[in-house]
Amino acid sequence: MKHSVSVTCCALLVSSISLSYAAEVPSGTVLAEKQELVRHIKDEPASLDPAKAVGLPEIQVIRDLFEGLVNQNEKGEIVPGVATQWKSNDNRIWTFTLRDNAKWADGTPVTAQDFVYSWQRLVDPKTLSPFAWFAALAGINNAQAIIDGKATPDQLGVTAVDAHTLKIQLDKPLPWFVNLTANFAFFPVQKANVESGKEWTKPGNLIGNGAYVLKDRVVNEKLVVVPNTHYWDNAKTVLQKVTFLPINQESAATKRYLAGDIDITESFPKNMYQKLLKDIPGQVYTPPQLGTYYYAFNTQKGPTADQRVRLALSMTIDRRLMTEKVLGTGEKPAWHFTPDVTAGFTPEPSPFEQMSQEELNAQAKTLLSAAGYGPQKPLKLTLLYNTSENHQKIAIAVASMWKKNLGVDVKLRNQEWKTYIDSRNTGNFDVIRASWVGDYNEPSTFLTLLTSTHSGNISRFNNPAYDKVLAQASTENTVKARNADYNAAEKILMEQAPIAPIYQYTNGRLIKPWLKGYPINNPEDVAYSRTMYIVKH
């Protein structure tokens, strides 16, 4: 990738002068006189404090109000933010050089100490940050100990060498560390602002360092942001007003879009997909997302403890039929756990992908028979999913495939979210619906989920060879070497079948033809209003 940190982890990146990620208006473009955008978000933001954010609604707004060390471009590649360059000789100690013209919205400079304060605050148990774990995931020295109350925040492995130099020490080498710093949890906050009182995130009070400032907020109605004149790249900001409308019903948001009240939606009802394609061609988008929908098998007890049973069940899921007919809204069949769009991942073709469904079904029957199941002794199991029309539709289709091709008696069981989570955490299931959307754009965010010690390992999969190859990947210095390890891990998953990947997520949204600069192909759907503009229409 052109500016991938993963590729150049041991080198110094070039200055940000040539890498500014802002609105790029082609020569000759006639801009609309009124540069005002209305964006749909799925709910009222729970908090505009980066350390308290957890859901996409607040994150979308926070990305406009604050800026971290690095940003993502339209392809999801890392580009400079507050930092102009970074280096590491061992992937363990990282040094970031901050731009000297980065300022807070009140005109004061953004310094390395601001990041030290913000990251210490993130892991401080008193902050109660729902994303404190991300600092531990990144491997910052003492992060987990501080979260657990066994060390103090000032012992975090982050120091300000001087006003514009930030040094971070990790507990082990991590080649893709810089990728993680694009996460909103690592955005800086101004200490004086935070300590000014509980209402520091309200309009008129909030002092961020992003391209926009919060001008107005009416709870459950709207949030309005306008350009931050002190932002280092403000000269390239085109949109002069962005209004976020929180609407939690897809149908209601779509209705307002069609009425001309909204320029871009976060989603649309899947059952309207074909109609929308027909009614508003060129405005319906379903780009790939960094996420996989899958079924997890209980590898520790019950019939699915047998690898042959798991593999037979996985092979019999007709992924092509599922995406084309059952879903039919642009999803792709998942032949790997790691989505195809993941940075640093070039998947080797799965043998399953190269076989017809008839061939897969025949092999699955042989496997199930070898495991002792057949017409005289049919396999019986329970398929658990959390309550949702979409999950139910998929479960019915899969159960039908298993019954028709393998004679499996499947009992479908749906549970409300809290009960479902309890069942998942206690291993009270045979097969359970699950999904994973990457926390960062690198294969490890998916594959480490199935390592033996990971809390998200729903299947309780325990495979030393799998753990070993992923541990090895974390020490590799090149994308090519890591990709080989990741494909080796995917091969183990295919053969052992602790999970059955079903489809890769897409991110459905509606976009008016006059809105340009939206990074529609960013796998994590990371978007900044400063890259967008409206053409004359």
Regions picked out by a protein language model, each given a short descriptive name:
Residues V25, V30, T95, T159, ...:
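Extracytoplasmic/peripheral linker and loop segments enriched in polar/acidic and small residues
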Residues H40-D90, Q120, N205-G208:
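N-terminal lobe/hinge region of extracytoplasmic solute-binding protein
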Residues E77, Q144, G149-Q155, T159, ...:
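Gly/Pro-rich hinge or "lid" segments in bacterial periplasmic/extracellular proteins
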Residues K215-V226, T243-K301, E324, P333:
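Extracellular/periplasmic solute-recognition and catalytic clefts
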Residues V219, N361, K365-G438, V479, ...:
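Ligand/substrate-recognition segments at binding pockets and active sites
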Residues K332-A370, S388-K393:
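Structural transition elements
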Residues R509-H537:
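Long beta-strand-rich cores associated with HINT superfamily self-processing modules
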